[in-house]
Amino acid sequence: MAELNFKAIEEKWQKRWLEAKIFEPNIRDKPKEKKFYITVAFPYLSGHLHVGHARTYTIPDVIARFKRMQGYNVLFPMAWHITGSPIVGIAERIKNRDPKTIWIYRDVYKVPEEILWTFEDPINIVKYFMKAAKETFIRAGFSVDWSREFYTTSLFPPFSKFIEWQFWKLKEKGYIVKGAHRVRWDPVVGTPLGDHDLMEGEDVPILDYIIIKFELRENGEVIYLPAATLRPETVYGVTNMWVNPNATYVKAKVRRKDKEETWIVSKEAAYKLSFQDREIEVIEEFKGEKLIGKYVRNPVSGDEVIILPAEFVDPDNATGVVMSVPAHAPFDHVALEDLKRETEILEKYDIDPRIVENITYISLIKLEGYGDFPAVEEVNKLGIKSQKDKEKLEQATKTIYKAEYHKGIFKVPPYEGKPVQEVKEAIAKEMLEKGIAEIMYEFAEKNVISRFGNRAVIKIIHDQWFIDYGNPEWKEKARKALERMKILPETRRAQFEAIIDWLDKKACARKIGLGTPLPWDPEWVIESLSDSTIYMAYYTISRHINKLRQEGKLDPEKLTPEFFDYIFLEEFSEDKEKELEKKTGIPAEIIHEMKEEFEYWYPLDWRCSGKDLIPNHLTFFIFNHVAIFREEHWPKGIAVNGFGTLEGQKMSKSKGNVLNFIDAIEENGADVVRLYIMSLAEHDSDFDWRRKEVGKLRKQIERFYELISQFAEYEVKGNVELKDIDRWMLHRLNKAIKETTNALEEFRTRTAVQWAFYSIMNDLRWYLRRTEGRDDEAKRYVLRTLADVWVRLMAPFTPHICEELWEKLGGEGFVSLAKWPEPVEEWWNETIEAEEEFIRSVMEDIKEIIEVAKIENAKRAYIYTAEDWKWKVAEVVSEKRDFKSSMEELMKDSEIRKHGKEVAKIVQKLIKERTFDVKRINEEKALREAKEFMEKELGIEIIINPTEDKGGKKKQAMPLKPAIFIE
């Protein structure tokens, strides 16, 4: 057969689908009970989609196609997300001729150079990638209703008015507040940063450090050395301070509110603190070595402690000053031990080594399983020798901190006898109230980079608009919705619950970037994670909006909150529709149809997205729906999918390790790409794209096409006389239908592919071997029937090839709209399946015996099937499942009693091997019917149950495990 031209077939059917508009559902076609509404997170248009995205979008398309074939009225729409600063940042970097950005867009995304330079205008980036993304989705065969397409921001005014309405609603309900809050901030551009505004570090948490002000007195001046800690309760155990002798520190005037103090912190810390409600005036810069050997006073205990050198202190983390608590901090203990050994370091700073030798550890926490100094014990236990054992030190630190926090009891008055969890909060609160400590916000990691290419800081913003996800009543409604929702996989539910619990105020607007202006404060632009939470409702009316827009009959400015209130929140009212017609210019009957569409399609059945969006978009999606819509319109389910890697490596456009979705289609064909990514892993697991494996799958799809094309030529006649092997094939086909259907209902795409493609292919291969030489009506009937079912089962995965084959089969209309196969009751035959499995097993056993025993020129196989009484034993053991009750039951049978000792051995064997699911079959009949096939396959004579007991094997025969002798 000539090589299959995937591209030609795909283009043919994509054209026909679009012309016939078969994916544009009409609410008049089916009752609401038969509607199915599924959406997926619309793509952000800052570049080409890669094969990781292909997974995210193919899963819902497969499900949409499956449900459509099941007879549902399916809505699967698509739109484009362009809100926020990333696109503006890209334009800025291209304008500045940033080499890395230019390389990504020219060499990785393959943007022609003459087009690339137009990207200095962000609108041109949007236009280019919007067109490319739509082409990719069409080329992928996605069954999208393109009549509902739109894009975000004020560049598409109707949607922008919808977002304005959403925000007025949130504000009315008290869910939008103004105030001060910590945010990620681009210090160069001067804007808050949401998750989508970051190039790196979107998952990096913000830590609340307590900075404790240790006093350093010089010439009568009080100077504070603020030590940053996440364990304020350990301030009672400080034995010394650490600074990095090689780092640059500053002495600075720090003004906060009406208070002014002099601090010494690292140069990096001074910069960061200037964004956190502090005015910093640097007086002096110097190296940390200047501080070594000086003493500071602990503001809590009053103890004077020495400042010691430590290169492990990172000046770019918090204040660059660390308090040492060696009894409870493994790093501190090991650093002191290193100093004791390396006295030359101390001598360099004129510190008497005896000072370090005489440092006394202070025990603060009683911890079961440890003595007074848990850090010392853990270091010794792990065999840590020096600060170079960094991995082990981090392990020890995690172990001690976790154990002390959860199980530790404080030993120092006035908190003696209280749990560490409680003491930690109390001590922090007390120090903050007394003014001897403050809070500094810091990232847990350094790699938090904005889309503008700048390193982010944490800033306290005043007069910022926030969505108050911390509102207790709102949280309760979100929990209620989550309880009612299906979450796939179910294991992700706990993550949603935790996020609802800790979610707090979220900055919802920026001063720069693309988006919708905040309606009551238009200097602010609504950010990308805030205008993408309820657009699934807009999809339901966007078809009508788009049509009016194309006809020039829509004035977006007249789409007021009153209009959206009626469509999405109120009851049907003819009077209201007439009133809105006057106000909007939209005919009352169109307004009525819009409301009908919303009421028909809502609630949303499934929301699909990647697992990275659980902490933000997907949880915000729940919150915003429960805030705005009636309970009957709350979403019903969320399906979360895993990530993709490329040849075992994480995909990264900055490293060039990325495969564009469109390139994968060009290289392999859409159906090959679709089937490959669906077959690799279940929807919730990660997958790895390997080019070599894709090539193998292409050949298998070509074989599928070849087989169906061949079977399509067979004419089907009724009343054919089927043989057992024919019935076996139909039974297996039934099983494939059932298992594929069950898997797709639960989004288990890999399992579905295993049954719909690989299982049928393997069963067919066996069937063709078993029926080789036959060309009768029964075989033709089975193969033609199989072709009809198989093409429909594969249609959600490989729609283009299946449309072509459906046409060859003479199927009515599009296979995309054909009836999904259902099991045929009369095809079920568990007995025949068991018999066929038995034949396979016996053949494998014969091959194994010949191979293991190294029998050359084997001529005959003598097969002895189990006697009837052994079947009775197996059946009783299957029912009773334990030795005593099985033997009691069996000994009631006089025939079985004759074999007493042998019965006991068999029962023990069956129980040990847990052989409980034994279905009786006529082994001899099955073997005799397959005798000719077995002889041909094995190349030896098969003799079944001869009277002669060859090799004394007969007594070894067990149910489903006959005795075999080879000569």
Curated annotation (Swiss-Prot):
Molecular function as annotated in GO: aminoacyl-tRNA deacylase activity; ATP binding; leucine-tRNA ligase activity
Class of the enzyme per the UniProt entry, highest EC level: ligase
EC number(s) reported in the record: 6.1.1.4
Lineage: Archaea, Methanobacteriati, Methanobacteriota, Thermococci, Thermococcales
Motif 'HIGH' region per record, residues: 43-53
Coiled coil: none
Protein name stated in the entry: Leucine--tRNA ligase
Keyword Cytoplasm: yes
Localization annotation: Cytoplasm
Coarse class of the protein's main subcellular location: cytoplasm
Stretch forming the signal peptide: none
Organism: Pyrococcus horikoshii (strain ATCC 700860 / DSM 12428 / JCM 9974 / NBRC 100139 / OT-3)
